[in-house]
Amino acid sequence: MAAVVENVVKLLGEQYYKDAMEQCHNYNARLCAERSVRLPFLDSQTGVAQSNCYIWMEKRHRGPGLASGQLYSYPARRWRKKRRAHPPEDPRLSFPSIKPDTDQTLKKEGLISQDGSSLEALLRTDPLEKRGAPDPRVDDDSLGEFPVTNSRARKRILEPDDFLDDLDDEDYEEDTPKRRGKGKSKGKGVGSARKKLDASILEDRDKPYACDICGKRYKNRPGLSYHYAHSHLAEEEGEDKEDSQPPTPVSQRSEEQKSKKGPDGLALPNNYCDFCLGDSKINKKTGQPEELVSCSDCGRSGHPSCLQFTPVMMAAVKTYRWQCIECKCCNICGTSENDDQLLFCDDCDRGYHMYCLTPSMSEPPEGSWSCHLCLDLLKEKASIYQNQNSS
């Protein structure tokens, strides 16, 4: 080995060799320092999550070699029991009880009060380190041994919990704070009730739209509208006005939504146009009175001329629960997902997903388009035929 080093020194020069070794030392020091800061880390080369280890030694830890050909030796690290170990259940392996003569030793050292307090009470209260005794533990990164306790009795007291207090650096576990809550089981019923309450609150947040009639919840307004149209609309049409009042709401959020809806389940309409800010008495763009068209989901209103409705479309929107462009959902699947695939009828303003149609479409057609409902109702007067005739 020495001959190889001498050959390299002769070939490159002594100063060059010293500079190279110094740079290598600096690189290794930076690499080790970086790894020690971010441990445990995921090794990008091997894909293995590296845990903390004790192979990094300082120059002050070096000792003379113990074997032939050994330049340095380093002190071995003290073995310590893992904190995950459980107390033995076998009575033969349990810790022996403290004898009366040991109690006398404890009283002399001031570890047990003279008023006869039991050892169990001493162990249940704060640890002895917190009562003024010095902490026997040394930092995990140091290589020093634990100092020997001043009496056998004190070591006997600390021995059952010693495996809990000696937290090894290799144990990166999430259950570290579990020791603090030992013996606190009074609020278990309150905690379970609080968890149920939190779960109901989270469900209300995930599904804020509730049905006023049956209390079923939905994540978005189009889903609730689809539920109204297919579940309760037929029942509401055949019932009287007194019988159509919704029952008691299931939650406070339902009560808030109930105040915003009419007896027929429709949202209370706004009395002004969202486009020109006029009302039914005057359209601020034309200066003429014009009735408002209101969304059945959000209650927003607009003049037909502001919405660019044709006379046929104006008559059609009065026959169903019309939705504004922000609340529009597919008339077939009832969802508002993939709104870029929605195709609107030029006769009734209903929306359809192009992939929900039969046959399905990949691209929107050129010119006007009429849905199957308007084709059956208007026949040759549908917009699609008017567009073909004009062309």
From Swiss-Prot:
Residue numbers carrying Phosphothreonine: T176
GO biological process: apoptotic process; apoptotic signaling pathway; chromatin remodeling; negative regulation of myeloid progenitor cell differentiation; negative regulation of transcription by RNA polymerase II; nervous system development; positive regulation of double-strand break repair; positive regulation of stem cell population maintenance
Classification via SMART domains: PHD (SM00249), ZnF_C2H2 (SM00355)
Cross-referenced InterPro entries: DPF1-3_N, Znf_C2H2_sf, Znf_C2H2_type, Znf_FYVE_PHD, Znf_PHD, Znf_PHD-finger, Znf_RING/FYVE/PHD
GO CC aspect terms: centrosome; chromatin; cytosol; intracellular membrane-bounded organelle; nBAF complex; nucleoplasm; nucleus; SWI/SNF complex
Tissue: Ubiquitous.
Transmembrane segments: none
Superkingdom of the source species: Eukaryota
Residue ranges covered by zinc fingers (PHD-type): 270-330, 327-377
Pfam families to which the protein is assigned, alphabetical: DPF1-3_N, PHD
Stretches the record annotates as Disordered: 79-146, 165-196, 233-266
Biased composition (Basic and acidic residues): 100-110, 126-140, 253-263
Cystine crosslinks: none
Biased composition (Acidic residues): 165-174
Gene3D superfamilies with a match to the protein in the record: Classic Zinc Finger, Zinc/RING finger domain, C3HC4 (zinc finger)
Residues found modified as N-acetylalanine: A2
Keyword presence, Heme: no
Consequence of changing C276F: In CSS7; abolishes interaction with acetylated or methylated histone H3
GO molecular function: histone H3K14ac reader activity; histone H4K16ac reader activity; transcription corepressor activity; zinc ion binding
PANTHER family according to UniProt: HL01030P-RELATED, ZINC FINGER PROTEIN UBI-D4
Similarity comment text for this entry: Belongs to the requiem/DPF family.
Protein name: Zinc finger protein ubi-d4
Organism name: Homo sapiens (Human)
Gene this chain is encoded by: DPF2
